[in-house]
Amino acid sequence: FPLRRSAIRTDAFRICYPRRKMVNTPRELFGRTIYVANHPASFMDPLVIAALRRPIVFFMTRADVFTPISKPFLWACQMLPIYRQHDGGDTKSKNNEVFKRASNVLKGGRSLLIFGEGFTDDVFIRRLKPVKKGAAKIGFEALESINWSKKIYMAGVGSNYSRPNQM
């Protein structure tokens, strides 16, 4: 969705966040990458990562925001629903379908962003929470579906904000 990408990359982003710092970035931009990120701030984390990555990134988003009204818009923004155990219901069978879609995204040379911690705290805490195993499962499923013929990369992304209460 070129319009969304260009809207995020506007000068407003650079004005609001004049001091950005990327550490240990790869020299080349790879497709087929699973970005596993922490999630300290609810709304800003995906925007920052999308603005800094050139290949189109598909986002794993919690499934409860996929209402009948919002679903078409979220699909257009390359968001895939992820069903969490602590939300209740039959998450395993629903996630198997989503993991297949995510695997197809990776097979198509696109990248995927998943927040591995699984949730955001109401209070900003400067430490990582335990990472869930879904990103590794998606990566292995994608590799198995292409018979291990292409590389799929996994990159950790850490977000930290100097003044999180002023966002």
How should each PLM-predicted stretch be described?
Residues 3-6, 11-167:
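Soluble catalytic domains of membrane acyltransferases
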